[in-house]
Structure formats: structure tokens, C-alpha cells
């Protein structure tokens, strides 16, 4: 990877911080506001420069269409890649691990514990697409608005988390899908982890 300018490094850190805080990248307008640019177009030019250097990928037509790109995918002891999860079984059960991949640890804050292969398009509008690899920090806690990997009864899903008393709402980011409502008094629910980034599922995987 070619060296980044101080401003490019600042933008990259902002993207990582936003992913940490909310589970999604910032918009161009948010970048411009936080870094004092005159317009979102200025932020776009810096993002294009980062894309040319192979640090991010820009997804056209999406206000938050920014993905971090991991370029170190050598098979070795590293983050486990979780594929299809059988109903009722532990997420990190050995039979679910499709491989281990080394990834630059500085890409994610907090650190990723594992990668989850995304199944479906329910989070499409924030750039999480079918077949992508979701970097997940293993935790049982989440704040409202964060993107989580959650287990509802025997099923695992990726959604935006909201809690209202004894009710959990798991919101999709695609109008073709419906919010999942969980009654904690009647249903089994657990947070498996917090989304800390998305990696494009390239041909090397």
C-alpha cells in the first residue's frame, strides 16, 4: 500500500471510528462536517484518493458506500471465518469455521474476533452485501443503533440493534425486509458480537 498523506490518514481514522461507534461508515457530508471541509465534494475527492491507494472501496450510489479493504489474506492462524451456522449450534463451533485469515489488526477498533460470511441483502443500504465478510468483535453488549450479530432462538442474524425495555427490535437496512421484534420474556435472545467493519469478499477468498 502506498503511504497516506496526513489528511488521508485522518479520514481513514474517522471511517474506522464511525464503524466502531455505529457499525457503519460516515457519509460524505459527515466527513466534511467533522474535518472542516467546505463541501461533501471535497470529502469525495479524498475518498477517491484512498480508493486509488487500495485502502477503501467506494460503492457507487450509496451515501455510506465505503468499505475497508483488507489486502492480507494469507491462510494462517488468524481470524476464523464463520460460514453457514446450523440452527442451535454455537457460532464459533469448529464445524462452522471455513478457514483462518490474517488481517491488519489496525483496520478495526475494537479488534475483530472473527469474520462472518454475510448471507442475504437485508443490510444492503449500508453497504453490507450478500457474500461480504463482516468483521465482528465478540461481545454480549451493544448500544442502540449499533450493528450486531444476534441470535434469536436458533437463528443468527445481522441487524441494527434497538432495545425498548423488555423488547428488542432488530432493524434491517433494506426496505424489502421487516424489523424483527423479540419479546425477552418469551424468546431466547443473545448478542454474539458487534460489527466493526466490512471486507469485500474477493476472489482470493
Swiss-Prot record:
Record text on subunit structure and interactions: Homodimer.
NCBIfam families: lexA
Record flagged with keyword Hydrolase: yes
Domain of life: Bacteria
Enzyme nomenclature, EC number: 3.4.21.88
Reaction catalysis annotation: Hydrolysis of Ala-|-Gly bond in repressor LexA
InterPro entries (alphabetical): LexA, LexA-like, LexA/Signal_pep-like_sf, LexA_DNA-bd_dom, LexA_repressor, Peptidase_S24_LexA, Peptidase_S24_S26A/B/C, WH-like_DNA-bd_sf
Source organism (scientific name): Idiomarina loihiensis (strain ATCC BAA-735 / DSM 15497 / L2-TR)
Pfam families hit by this protein: LexA_DNA_bind (PF01726), Peptidase_S24 (PF00717)
Keywords, in A-Z order: Autocatalytic cleavage, DNA damage, DNA repair, DNA replication, DNA-binding, Hydrolase, Repressor, SOS response, Transcription, Transcription regulation
Protein's UniProt name: LexA repressor
Function: Represses a number of genes involved in the response to DNA damage (SOS response), including recA and lexA. In the presence of single-stranded DNA, RecA interacts with LexA causing an autocatalytic cleavage which disrupts the DNA-binding part of LexA, leading to derepression of the SOS regulon and eventually DNA repair.
GO molecular function (one): serine-type endopeptidase activity
Family as reported in the entry's similarity comment: Belongs to the peptidase S24 family.
Gene that specifies this protein: lexA
Amino acid at each position: 500500500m502506498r503511504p497516506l498523506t496526513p489528511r488521508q490518514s485522518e479520514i481513514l481514522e474517522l471511517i474506522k471510528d464511525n464503524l466502531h461507534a455505529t457499525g457503519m461508515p460516515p457519509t460524505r457530508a459527515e466527513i466534511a462536517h467533522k474535518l472542516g471541509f467546505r463541501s461533501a465534494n471535497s470529502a469525495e475527492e479524498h475518498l477517491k484518493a484512498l480508493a486509488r491507494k487500495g485502502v477503501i472501496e467506494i460503492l457507487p450510489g450509496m451515501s455510506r458506500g465505503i468499505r475497508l479493504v483488507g489486502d492480507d489474506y494469507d491462510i494462517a492462524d488468524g481470524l476464523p471465518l464463520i460460514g453457514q451456522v446450523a440452527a442451535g449450534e454455537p457460532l464459533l463451533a469448529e464445524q462452522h469455521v471455513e478457514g483462518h485469515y490474517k488481517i491488519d489488526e489496525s483496520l478495526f477498533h475494537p479488534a475483530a474476533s472473527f469474520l462472518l460470511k454475510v448471507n442475504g441483502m437485508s443490510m444492503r443500504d449500508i453497504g453490507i452485501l450478500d457474500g461480504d465478510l463482516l468483521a465482528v468483535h465478540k461481545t454480549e453488549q451493544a448500544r442502540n443503533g449499533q450493528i450486531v450479530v444476534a441470535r434469536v432462538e436458533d437463528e443468527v442474524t445481522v441487524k441494527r440493534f434497538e432495545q425498548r425495555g423488555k423488547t428488542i427490535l432488530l432493524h434491517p437496512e433494506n426496505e424489502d425486509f421487516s424489523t424483527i421484534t423479540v419479546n425477552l420474556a418469551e424468546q431466547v435472545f443473545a448478542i454474539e458480537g458487534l460489527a466493526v467493519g466490512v471486507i469485500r469478499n474477493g476472489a482470493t477468498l
